[in-house]
C-alpha cells in the first residue's frame, strides 16, 4: 500500500457550506469557488457534475451524505459542504448543517427567497450555525437594480425573523455560472465573496479541551486493516492508541482502541474538534457499530431514553404539520446522525401543541441514545422536518 500523503495543519480550519433553495445555484457556486482558487493553486477544481452526484449515491447503497470539497484562501483552510436542496435530502441538510461553522446562503435574484430558503435558514438556526453570508446569484439575469435591492431586503428580513442579524449580514451579488465559465469580472466577485467569508465568519473556538466525541456518520471496512467509522469530531481530540467507547442505540457499550486517523485520505497525527475524519478501530466488526452511535472517550457520555426538550414546532408554511398534536404523539427524533422513534408527553395544563408553538415536553425514546443537555435534535414525520429542539434536561 502506498504511503499516504500527510495532512499538514498550517492555517486555521473552518467548516462552511452552501445552503438555499433548489436550483438557486449552490452547487454552481461551490464549483466556481474551487475553480477560481485552483487557478491560484489553493484548491483542486471540482466539476459541477462530481459535486452534484453526491446525493445520488444514497440510492445505490453507498452512504455519501453530502459533497465535501476542500480549499484554501490566503488565510484559512476550508472544508465546504454542499447540502443538496431537495426535501428528500433534508436529513442530509441536518447532518450537513450541523457541521458548519458558517454558511453561504445562495438566493437567486431572479426568484427571491423561496420555501427552502426559509427552511434552510430555520435549520441553520436550530443546528447552531451562527454566521451566514448571503450570495445573491444570477444578478446578471435581472435588468433592474431596484429589483435586486428588493430581493436583498427580503432576504435580510427573513434572516432577522430567525434571529440572525439581518441588517449586518454581508451580501455579495454576482453570477456563479459566469464565474465558472471564466468571466474575469465574476471570478473577482467569487474572490471577494471568499474575502467576506474570511472576515465575517470567525475562526471557531474548537472545544478541543473537552472529552473526545464523534457522532458516527458512516462505517466501512478496509480489507486487511479493519473497520473505519467516519464523521465530524464534535469535541476533544483523538490519536492512535486512544481508548474509545462505541455508545448509543444498543444497551451495551463496546470498547476499542484507535489504530488510525485520516482526514481527506491523508494520515493525521491528531484529529481534533471540527475535523471530518475516518477512525480505524481495533477488534470491531462492521456489524458492531452503526450510523447514529457515537465514539467517545470512555465514561464521558451515557445513553438515555428519557429527556426534556425545548422545542419549536414548525408552521404549515414552513413545511411543518397542518394540525396540532397531543400527548402520546410518536414522531422520529433525529439525534447526531439518525432517527429514533419517541413518545411525547406534554406538560400539565398543555392539551395540545399547535404548529408555530414553542413548547417544553418530555420524550421517551424507543432506543437508548448518547444524550446530554444542550444536544440539538430535529423532529421528523414521514421524512419531513416538523420541529426542532434542544435537550434541556436528561431524566433517566
From Swiss-Prot:
Q: Tell me which EC number(s) this protein carries.
A: 3.6.5.3
Q: What are the start and end residues of every segment in region (G5)?
A: 175-177
Which InterPro entries does the record match to this protein? EF-Tu_GTP-bd (IPR041709), EF-Tu_GTPase (IPR050055), EFTu-like_2 (IPR004161), EFTU_2 (IPR033720), G_TR_CS (IPR031157), P-loop_NTPase (IPR027417), Small_GTP-bd (IPR005225), T_Tr_GTP-bd_dom (IPR000795)
Q: Which keywords fit this entry according to its UniProt record?
A: Cytoplasm, Elongation factor, GTP-binding, Hydrolase, Magnesium, Metal-binding, Nucleotide-binding, Protein biosynthesis
Region annotation (G2) maps to: 61-65
The entry lists its GO molecular-function terms as: GTP binding; GTPase activity; translation elongation factor activity
Q: Which reaction does it catalyse?
A: GTP + H2O = GDP + phosphate + H(+)
Q: What class of enzyme is it?
A: hydrolase
Q: Which Pfam families does the protein's record reference? A: GTP_EFTU (PF00009), GTP_EFTU_D2 (PF03144), GTP_EFTU_D3 (PF03143)
Residue ranges occupied by any tr-type G domain in the UniProt entry: 11-205
Q: How does it assemble?
A: Monomer.
Query: Which NCBIfam families does this entry report, sorted A to Z?
Result: EF-Tu, PRK00049.1, PRK12735.1, PRK12736.1, small_GTP
Task: Name the chain's protein.
Answer: Elongation factor Tu
Q: Which organism is it from?
A: Limosilactobacillus fermentum (strain NBRC 3956 / LMG 18251) (Lactobacillus fermentum)
Q: By which gene is this protein encoded? A: tuf
Amino acid at each position: 500500500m502506498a504511503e499516504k500523503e500527510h495532512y499538514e495543519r498550517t492555517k486555521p480550519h473552518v467548516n462552511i457550506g452552501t445552503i438555499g433553495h433548489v436550483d438557486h445555484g449552490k452547487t454552481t457556486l461551490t464549483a466556481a469557488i474551487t475553480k477560481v482558487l485552483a487557478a491560484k493553486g489553493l484548491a483542486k477544481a471540482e466539476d459541477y457534475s462530481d459535486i452534484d452526484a453526491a446525493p445520488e449515491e444514497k440510492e445505490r447503497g453507498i452512504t455519501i451524505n453530502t459533497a465535501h470539497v476542500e480549499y484554501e484562501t490566503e488565510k484559512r483552510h476550508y472544508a465546504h459542504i454542499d447540502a443538496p436542496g431537495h426535501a428528500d435530502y433534508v436529513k442530509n441538510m441536518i447532518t450537513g448543517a450541523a457541521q458548519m461553522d458558517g454558511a453561504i446562503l445562495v438566493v437567486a435574484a431572479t426568484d427571491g427567497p423561496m420555501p427552502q430558503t426559509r427552511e434552510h435558514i430555520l435549520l441553520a438556526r436550530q443546528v447552531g450555525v451562527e454566521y451566514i453570508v448571503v450570495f445573491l446569484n444570477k444578478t446578471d439575469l435581472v435588468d433592474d437594480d431596484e429589483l435586486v435591492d428588493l430581493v436583498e431586503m427580503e432576504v435580510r428580513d427573513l434572516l432577522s425573523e430567525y434571529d440572525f442579524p439581518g441588517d449586518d449580514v454581508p451580501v455579495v451579488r454576482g453570477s456563479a455560472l459566469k464565474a465558472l465559465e471564466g468571466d474575469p469580472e465574476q471570478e473577482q466577485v467569487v474572490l471577494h465573496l471568499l474575502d467576506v467569508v474570511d472576515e465575517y465568519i470567525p475562526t471557531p473556538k474548537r472545544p478541543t479541551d473537552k472529552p473526545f466525541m464523534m457522532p458516527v456518520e458512516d462505517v466501512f471496512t478496509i480489507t486487511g486493516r479493519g473497520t473505519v467509522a467516519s464523521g465530524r469530531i464534535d469535541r476533544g481530540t483523538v490519536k492512535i492508541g486512544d481508548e474509545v467507547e462505541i455508545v448509543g442505540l444498543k444497551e451495551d457499550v463496546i470498547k476499542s482502541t484507535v489504530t488510525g486517523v485520516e482526514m481527506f485520505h491523508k494520515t493525521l497525527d491528531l484529529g481534533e474538534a471540527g475535523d471530518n475524519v475516518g477512525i480505524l478501530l481495533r477488534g470491531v466488526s462492521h456489524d458492531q457499530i452503526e450510523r447514529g452511535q457515537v465514539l467517545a472517550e470512555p465514561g464521558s457520555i451515557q445513553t438515555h431514553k428519557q429527556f426534556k426538550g425545548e422545542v419549536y414546532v414548525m408552521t404549515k408554511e414552513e413545511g411543518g404539520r397542518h394540525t396540532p398534536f397531543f400527548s402520546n404523539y410518536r414522531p422520529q427524533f433525529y439525534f447526531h446522525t439518525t432517527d429514533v422513534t419517541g413518545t411525547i408527553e406534554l406538560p400539565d395544563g398543555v392539551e395540545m401543541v399547535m404548529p408555530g408553538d414553542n413548547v417544553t415536553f418530555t420524550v421517551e425514546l424507543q432506543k437508548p441514545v448518547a444524550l446530554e443537555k444542550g444536544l440539538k435534535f430535529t423532529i421528523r414525520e414521514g421524512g419531513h422536518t416538523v420541529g426542532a429542539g434542544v435537550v434541556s434536561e436528561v431524566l433517566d
